[in-house]
Amino acid sequence: MTKLSVNINKVATLRNARGGDTPNVVKVALDCEAFGADGITVHPRPDERHIRRADVYDLRPLLRTEFNIEGYPSPEFIDLVLKVKPHQVTLVPDDPSQITSNSGWDTKANLEFLSEVLDQFNSAGIRTSVFVAADPEMVEYAAKAGADRVELYTEPYATAYPKNPEAAVAPFVEAAKTARKLGIGLNAGHDLSLVNLNYFYKNIPWVDEVSIGHALISDALYLGLERTIQEYKNCLR
């Protein structure tokens, strides 16, 4: 079964826009779980413009589903993850100033660096995932670095999907087959939505997890959070 992890960064962005604690990030996360989410994802950035370090500590003891922390592996990020010990850590190659993740790792060029970082998390018993483009070579080098999983960066799929779904998903199928052949797990995320998720799933039904935030929270403005989560879960059947 493919798991749905809800990225709650946008909830934190809304809270931070006015100060105070509305909406309450922890309550929204717990409600997401109650409404059927299989996990919660956060991406704490150095400037704390959405998720704050304090949020990460507040969430960890209360969540009943999988907790996934994603981010660039700076010393501060590594320290946070090792202290909090989430179920999964996802490494992304973001510059701190980026609005959102917009590329995967060059796992070949960064093999030594990633290997050293992944070893720290693996030794702590934290499942590891590396954010990569739909390129079999990048998947192969992520496996060589010691990643338990890769997360496929799906923005190119989402962009190309409206014009030619078959062509859009083709490179992702090949990358997914490579991961399966190598025996590592497979996640996917970025710009997946109610429009394109089911087609992606039908072509790659062995994907372990999808992480969705912006589209899901946007849909919830119209449909409500509970119905929205159920709609996304329906896309994974």
Curated annotation (Swiss-Prot):
Binding site for 3-amino-2-oxopropyl phosphate: N7, R18, D191, G213, H214
Enzyme class, first EC level, given as a word: transferase
Residues the record lists as binding 1-deoxy-D-xylulose 5-phosphate: R45, H50, T100
Its EC number(s): 2.6.99.2
Active site, UniProt feature: H43 (proton acceptor), E70 (proton acceptor), H190 (proton donor)
Gene Ontology CC annotations of this record: cytosol
The protein's role, per its UniProt record: Catalyzes the complicated ring closure reaction between the two acyclic compounds 1-deoxy-D-xylulose-5-phosphate (DXP) and 3-amino-2-oxopropyl phosphate (1-amino-acetone-3-phosphate or AAP) to form pyridoxine 5'-phosphate (PNP) and inorganic phosphate.
Domain of life: Bacteria
Site positions for Transition state stabilizer: E151
Pfam families registered for this protein in UniProt: PdxJ
Protein family: Belongs to the PNP synthase family.
One GO BP: pyridoxine biosynthetic process
Name of the protein described by the UniProt record: Pyridoxine 5'-phosphate synthase
Native source species: Bacteroides thetaiotaomicron (strain ATCC 29148 / DSM 2079 / JCM 5827 / CCUG 10774 / NCTC 10582 / VPI-5482 / E50)
Keyword terms, alphabetized: Cytoplasm, Pyridoxine biosynthesis, Transferase
Gene3D superfamilies: Aldolase class I
Keyword Disulfide bond: no
Keyword Transferase: yes
Catalytic activity: 3-amino-2-oxopropyl phosphate + 1-deoxy-D-xylulose 5-phosphate = pyridoxine 5'-phosphate + phosphate + 2 H2O + H(+)
HAMAP family: PdxJ
Pathway: Cofactor biosynthesis; pyridoxine 5'-phosphate biosynthesis; pyridoxine 5'-phosphate from D-erythrose 4-phosphate: step 5/5
Subcellular location(s) per record: Cytoplasm
Gene Ontology molecular-function annotations: pyridoxine 5'-phosphate synthase activity
